[in-house]
């Protein structure tokens, strides 16, 4: 499964305006990653896990259901985080010039495919 997931991430990075993508456990452990830059996936995994945990807690406190996605936009780029049940998240890093809707749509599509592949094994 990891090789199929890596291919999915590689395809996303070559067909979409993204700098890299990775699948992490919700605990913050790297699972599969594909970054075009020298990005340290262990560092990104820890930050994504922190954001995920905080967001899950917020949704619980506000009684807004389960977490589906997070979009973080900065002046130099954006990161889209999408839940990949069971127990994983997909993080997609894109430059500022990338259209948020396009990146988000591609991330959701890849997350669905990742979920399907992971569920086949487990």
Segments from the language model and where they lie:
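Acidic, low-complexity cytosolic segments
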Residues: 1-20, 27-122
């Amino acid at each position: 499964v990891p090789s199929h997931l890596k291919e999915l991430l590689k395809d996303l990075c070559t067909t979409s305006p993204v700098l890299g993508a990775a699948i992490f456990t919700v605990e913050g452990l790297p699972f599969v990653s594909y970054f075009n830059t020298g990005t340290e996936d262990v560092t990104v995994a820890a930050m994504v896990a922190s954001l995920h945990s905080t967001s899950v807690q917020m949704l619980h406190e506000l009684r807004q259901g389960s977490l589906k996605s997070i979009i973080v936009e900065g002046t130099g780029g954006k990161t889209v985080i999408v839940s990949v049940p069971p127990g994983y998240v997909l993080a997609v890093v894109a430059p500022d010039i990338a259209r948020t809707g396009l990146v988000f749509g591609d991330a959701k599509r890849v997350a669905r495919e990742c979920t399907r592949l992971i569920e086949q094994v487990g």
